[in-house]
């Protein structure tokens, strides 16, 4: 497949090049704006909607009145009467069973949307330009791998076809039948309630046949699934960009292809079939930004780059980070050193003072021991021995001694052992 520029080959009904060429219309070089296409498609699609609404009486066809307050139930209106489950049930409210919906739909909603004519034409130009790019057409899902050329133009003889078998043979010769087979394979049942509303089956989109005059071409192609037929004078954005996505596979007749310049004009000449209409211009003629920015005209107007780089320094707390503190206050190192030395000096003084006090205490204890006539105890062992000596208790005198004195145990009289003579029984 080729994307031909600026001449397009015209293909015969046998699928071969007829030898004729057509100049590529300027509309195929128009800017592709998917945002505009999507906006126009969304708004125009709303014009096919049929108004719908719920009945104005729905949910209100019962007699109900609120019970008021003081009954320990909600104040919603309740059905009158008795003898049935319905009596006493809530009514009217959107939270009630059998009540009306919230904000009942009305038929006087603003169903339709008006779109500017120039904007609609811009969308059609974008859709036509996208249909000539193989990448966009293939991304849409069309099977055009074997198609000889894009845009695909055929002879005007095709407009005179009246039989479907002729149309099928043409599509097979043009290698476009793969796209129809894709449609056949995609036919399936719709999911959801559309099945109940005469929309049971769905399928993919196939090629779009664009013609100039209907000499039977509609009857020949209309029964092939997925085919869409359009008159070149009545192009529709809903058909050229289904779903609001550009890239529809289009097959043109020669006369319809030649008529595009008259319909949409070029950038040098206005459209002859539309009043005061010119093709939309590109925002940028050259889209190679690197080439534009490096051009001498742009570089001459630019200032020289600033080589100095200002790096953001991470803010650190000088009270926790000594290196940052020394940057801010170099004397902090001296202060810190003096503090450490002062603490060491004070610690040494406390240790010396404690040692002197211990020596004085030891000397005092030695003097007392010498006065008592005891050998002075020296060292830790002596201290432990001195500590370990038990104090002798003073003897108790008087009533306390009598109370605390234990009674002496009574001695049993000693039994005499019998002698041998006593042991002998009497004769």
From Swiss-Prot:
GO terms for biological process: cytoplasmic translation; translation. It is found in: Cytoplasm. Residues 369-427 are annotated as: Disordered. The modification N6-acetyllysine is found at residues 14, 106, 259, 333, 353, 364. Keywords: Acetylation, Citrullination, Cytoplasm, Isopeptide bond, Methylation, Phosphoprotein, Ribonucleoprotein, Ribosomal protein, Ubl conjugation. The modification N-acetylalanine is found at residue 2. The modification Omega-N-methylarginine is found at residue 97. The modification Phosphothreonine is found at residue 266. The modification Phosphoserine is found at residues 290, 295, 365. GO terms for cellular component: cytoplasm; cytosol; cytosolic large ribosomal subunit; cytosolic ribosome; endoplasmic reticulum; extracellular exosome; focal adhesion; membrane. Citrullinated by PADI4. Component of the large ribosomal subunit. May bind IPO9 with low affinity. Interacts with RBM3. Belongs to the universal ribosomal protein uL4 family. Component of the large ribosomal subunit. The ribosome is a large ribonucleoprotein complex responsible for the synthesis of proteins in the cell. This is Large ribosomal subunit protein uL4. It comes from Homo sapiens (Human).
